């Protein structure tokens, strides 16, 4: 099925079916195409073309209608070989800059504000579920560590990393410490570890702190805790989601059971994060030519819960770290628009986090 190259006529009809279905959410018939598009083809000819497309698995007929709707294969052919992504238009660009650019100019204290803002703007503009996955931190460059004493046996450790990223951990202490002790140890850590990546610190912290000033017991505790202090945050803690109200308003989710299934999936932040993360490692076949964008459609997704969804994702950068932006929505998605706004937001987010260095 779908093994040969489609003719120009077949490509035109398939493109019209998908574009019309995206707008109307209604199956598309040959008469509709003949009346609304100047292809120079009769209703009968269009019907024959649609029959060929159906035989090859690009479209199919829902049991309740005489019209046709795209299959996963049809959408795949469309995004790979028919879709033309234009540059973002000026009105939309201004709207995104108004909503997001204000925060970028204010240079907020941490990455959390930036990433959450990006998710909200992307969800609002795309009218889909938007997902921002913060970068993995193995290659993140350590700037400084601050320790805040909460009680004599409890303290908060704050790791500051390049590009506004901050990691916070509360530690229970098996020994009593004073503010002077944590100040001395913090100074030693910052002097000896600043500028290293977190993975370098995990491998060499004991050697690098050997023979340094400061309370030995507290330094030993930091060394023993390096695996958690200087390690990745759990993937679900790296996830920022927005736009649930837009995706549940789509016709595909009118039935209460479908809405419940969707909300259950969204609330499982680990699963959503894994979906977006995996989309970045999928086959080159899922990337339209000349695009740094992955589009995973329906059955191409890694879980049953996402079989009726499309995931469009692209990387963004913060120094030498890589995060991922994604749009999740029904397969009946305006793919050109999704790719356009996703690329623009990725560029904006990269610029903001790069300027923060």
Swiss-Prot record:
Task: Give the keywords, sorted.
Answer: Repressor, Stress response, Transcription, Transcription regulation
What is a biological process (GO) this protein takes part in?
Answer: negative regulation of DNA-templated transcription
- The organism encoding this protein is Chlorobium phaeovibrioides (strain DSM 265 / 1930)
**Which superkingdom is the protein from?**
Bacteria
Q: What HAMAP family does this protein's entry cite?
A: HrcA (MF_00081)
SUPFAM superfamilies membership: GAF domain-like, Winged helix' DNA-binding domain
Similarity remark = Belongs to the HrcA family.
What is the designated name of this protein? Heat-inducible transcription repressor HrcA
Q: What is the lineage of its organism?
A: Bacteria, Pseudomonadati, Chlorobiota, Chlorobiia, Chlorobiales
Function of the molecule:
Negative regulator of class I heat shock genes (grpE-dnaK-dnaJ and groELS operons). Prevents heat-shock induction of these operons.
In terms of Gene3D superfamilies, this protein maps to: 3.30.450.40, Heat-inducible transcription repressor hrca homolog, domain 3, Winged helix-like DNA-binding domain superfamily/Winged helix DNA-binding domain
Which Pfam families is this protein grouped with? HrcA (PF01628)
GO molecular-function terms, A-Z: DNA binding
